[in-house]
């Protein structure tokens, strides 16, 4: 049975806090680009951009990023054949930009590592920062978020699920013991 950790209002407050932190830690927001990791990271990135627009009256580009080709745990039947890299995946130029990579949950760090590999194939940003709604710990790689909505310590046998209205039809963050 899932236990609710954050409701929709708490999620919005966490995203607003992240937005303020982004403004405070950057000298201006003109060079920012949000890249959301599919699926729910894209919706969170769009919300951050919208909130930033409300606060600073500036349009920040948002692009979705599919990291499935870059995962180190995906099955490749023919190990001699490298996956085809879609360098035109982003519809915005990230070269010389400050990219804020957005994801819903940070766990082992493997998804973020895959996203970093993908981004480096698509351009050369001046800086990459990581914003996550939930950091649940248990890192397997030396990856640390720059902006965190909520730290939620978990056990390895628990699952954290983020639901967003745009995709799931409701909003909350739940934790489930498997």
Swiss-Prot record:
The text of the family note is: Belongs to the purine/pyrimidine phosphoribosyltransferase family. PyrR subfamily.
Cite the EC number: 2.4.2.9
Q: Name the PANTHER family on file.
A: BIFUNCTIONAL PROTEIN PYRR
Q: This protein is called what? A: Bifunctional protein PyrR
Q: What are the alphabetically sorted keywords of the record? A: Glycosyltransferase, RNA-binding, Transcription, Transcription regulation, Transcription termination, Transferase
Q: Name the Gene Ontology molecular function terms of this record.
A: RNA binding; uracil phosphoribosyltransferase activity
Motif position, PRPP-binding? 99-111
Q: What does this protein do?
A: Regulates transcriptional attenuation of the pyrimidine nucleotide (pyr) operon by binding in a uridine-dependent manner to specific sites on pyr mRNA. This disrupts an antiterminator hairpin in the RNA and favors formation of a downstream transcription terminator, leading to a reduced expression of downstream genes. Also displays a weak uracil phosphoribosyltransferase activity which is not physiologically significant.
Highest taxon of source? Bacteria
Q: Which Pfam families match?
A: Pribosyltran
| Keyword rRNA-binding on entry | no
Q: Which gene encodes it?
A: pyrR
Query: Per the record, what are the reactions this protein catalyses?
Result: UMP + diphosphate = 5-phospho-alpha-D-ribose 1-diphosphate + uracil
What subunit structure does UniProt give?
Homodimer and homohexamer; in equilibrium.
Q: Might you name a Gene Ontology BP term for this protein?
A: DNA-templated transcription termination
Q: What is the lineage of its organism?
A: Bacteria, Bacillati, Bacillota, Bacilli, Lactobacillales
Q: Which organism is it from?
A: Limosilactobacillus reuteri subsp. reuteri (strain JCM 1112)
């Amino acid at each position: 049975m899932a236990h609710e950790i954050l409701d929709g209002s708490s999620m919005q407050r966490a995203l607003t806090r992240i937005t303020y932190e982004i403004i405070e830690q950057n000298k201006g927001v003109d060079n920012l680009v949000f890249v959301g990791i599919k699926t729910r990271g894209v919706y969170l990135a769009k919300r951050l951009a919208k909130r930033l627009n409300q606060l600073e009256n500036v349009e920040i580009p948002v692009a979705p990023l599919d990291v499935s080709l870059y995962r180190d745990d995906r099955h490749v039947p023919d190990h001699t054949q490298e996956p085809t890299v879609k360098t035109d995946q982003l519809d915005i130029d990230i070269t010389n930009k400050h990219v804020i990579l957005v994801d819903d949950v940070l766990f082992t760090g493997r998804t973020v590592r895959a996203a970093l590999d993908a981004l480096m194939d698509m351009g050369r940003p001046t800086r990459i920062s990581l914003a996550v709604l939930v950091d649940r710990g248990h890192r397997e790689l030396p990856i640390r978020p720059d902006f965190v909505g909520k730290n939620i310590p978990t056990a390895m046998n628990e699952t954290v699920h983020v639901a967003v209205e745009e995709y799931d039809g409701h909003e909350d963050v739940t934790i489930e013991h498997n």
